[in-house]
Amino acid sequence: MAGLSNSQIPDGEFTAVVYRLIRDSRYSEAVQLLSAELQRSSRSRAGLSLLAYCYYRLQEFELAAECYEQLSQMHPELEQYRLYQAQALYKACLYPEATRVAFLLDNPTFYSRVLRLQAAIKYSEGDLPGARSLVEQLLSGEAGEDSGGENDPDGLVNMGCLLYKEGHYEAACSKFFAALQASGYQPDVSYNLALACYSNRHYAPALKHIANIIERGIRQHPELGVGMTTEGIDVRSVGNTVVLHQTALVEAFNLKAAIEYQLRNYEAAQEALTDMPPRAEEELDPVTLHNQALMNMDAKPTEGFEKLQFLLQQNPFPPETFGNLLLLYCKYEYFDLAADVLAENAHLTYKFLTPYLYDFLDAMITCQTAPEEAFIKLDGLAGMLTEQLRRLTKQVQEARHNRDDEVVIKAVNEYDETLEKYIPVLMAQAKIYWNLENYPMVEKIFRKSVEFCNDHDVWKLNVAHVLFMQENKYKEAIGFYEPIVKKNYDNILSVSAIVLANLCVSYIMTSQNEEAEELMRKIEKEEEQLSYGDPDKKIYHLCIVNLVIGTLYCAKGNYDFGISRVIKSLEPYHKKLGTDTWYYAKRCFLSLLENMSKHTIMLRDSVIQECVQFLEHCEIFGRNIPAVIEQPLEEERMHIGKNTVTYESRQLKALIYEIIGWNM
């Protein structure tokens, strides 16, 4: 509905209309009317005051600050305008400007409010000692009657926030809990408590507090449309309203997503983000945008990079943004971009990167041009972390001997955190030799770390892979692959298809064909059950297992059986043909064509005919399937008509005809 214009409002009704709009939270319309009115009467105190209020409610804090600045200049005797200006500047994250305005306030009436504001500014700037000094001043009662005391809910929350920033999560939890008991349920305080529990790795109580926030938000504000997007219901944006902010629903869903992500429940993490009240992308807060980028990175990497790059230009941005963008550049092997971002943002390096993360990124970037130097850097980092792990192991043993449960829990948590730092360093070292196909050296690196990593799933998986690649250690590879598969046997499709395929090949190569067949029957059974619920869903596990087995026979020179296995594995084509499965299939065909062109093998006409028919089927079903998933930030894109399974299958068919001398 179009907004009212000033000319449509009857004489004498302007003020009433504006107040009605504000009462109904229609602040944008009120801003239009007030702005037009102020063009005619620019020194209207009432008009400017209402406009500032509307801007503040719309979270246009800089514009609100400008209005309050005008008011304080027009009425210097009314110091509350200067206070409101300082508060608006603080909300706009303009901390130096907010501090400057706050220092101009010397009215005793506002003393405690100014102290609170100054403490909040110092806290946001990272000056924790300065913030603590001001908070303690408030708690002592020095700031007047309304400054509160030790049991004042605001004071408890402030102390809780300081303790949280200082890393004292247990003590912070106690303060937030006491604040809730003193004031009753407050969504923002409940969120603070959940966040402190999360940071202390107490995920169950954190999720309990989050569930309470969400449940109350849904019950009290059904109009916010919680869960609608996940259910596929098309709903309009609820906007960034004050009500939404007061419910702490956005913060709660973001924290829930972070916990599920930490627990490797990636689907649940994505669902938490889509469950939150719907907003347009341009309305999203920085934390939600950051989390969306991370959790959809596998499916939409280009969008993910764009969002993180955008956030880096904002003030403020989530502190994790800088490190995560650099790590993702390294993951996707954009080392030059990572180096450029580090060089261009030296001021952010010291603020947002720990010494460990900086050294790790430096080594990863060095890998591209000087792998030997990178290995030495990583080795130094690994040595430092192994020393920490040994020290923490000793601490845990001593604490258990002394039956000090609190120290045990703290040391175990610290050990787990250090191990999570050590694993990426170890894998980066191993990858240097993996890229050189020096698998015995990779195995040697892993064996050196067995003391700390023998229970870590990532380590076990990579040990299995390196044993498998050596082709004479299939039995040892089974010893590492089997526990991974058995651990998830009741949900076998949650296991990576390549793990299942490598285990099957290892069984075959060690003459354990019955075990291989049993595993394949189990995969087939689960795929059938899944297809009953969703007949159109593409499931590739059994297909990839058969493709890898077919590849094995082709590698051994048995192309008749190997190629037939590859062809059968992709039936039916509409469900089995995809970018990954085509990758395995075309490798076998290229190997076959290479050997045919060298006249090292001869194929029966029936097999050649089978190959041609297979490629014709791929041509039909592969029109909309990319042959290659391009890198997300690739400047020169492949021709859209060439990057399809259809195009590549035609090329392979033409090569077959050329080699055997058939006329097309």
Curated annotation (Swiss-Prot):
Biological process, per Gene Ontology: intraciliary transport
Compartment list: Cell projection, Cilium
Keyword presence, Transmembrane helix: no
Chain segments annotated as coiled-coil in the UniProt record: 507-534
Main location: other
InterPro entries: TPR-like_helical_dom_sf, TPR_rpt, TT30
Alphabetized Gene3D superfamilies for the sequence: Tetratricopeptide repeat domain
GO cellular component: cilium; intraciliary transport particle B
The TPR repeat ranges on this chain: 11-44, 45-78, 153-186, 188-220, 395-423, 424-456, 458-491, 543-576
Record key words, sorted: Cell projection, Cilium, Cilium biogenesis/degradation, Coiled coil, Repeat, TPR repeat
Subunit-structure text: Interacts wit the IFT B complex component IFT52.
Function per UniProt: Required for polyglutamylation of axonemal tubulin. Plays a role in anterograde intraflagellar transport (IFT), the process by which cilia precursors are transported from the base of the cilium to the site of their incorporation at the tip.
Recorded family membership: Belongs to the TTC30/dfy-1/fleer family.
Name of the featured protein: Intraflagellar transport protein 70A2
Species: Mus musculus
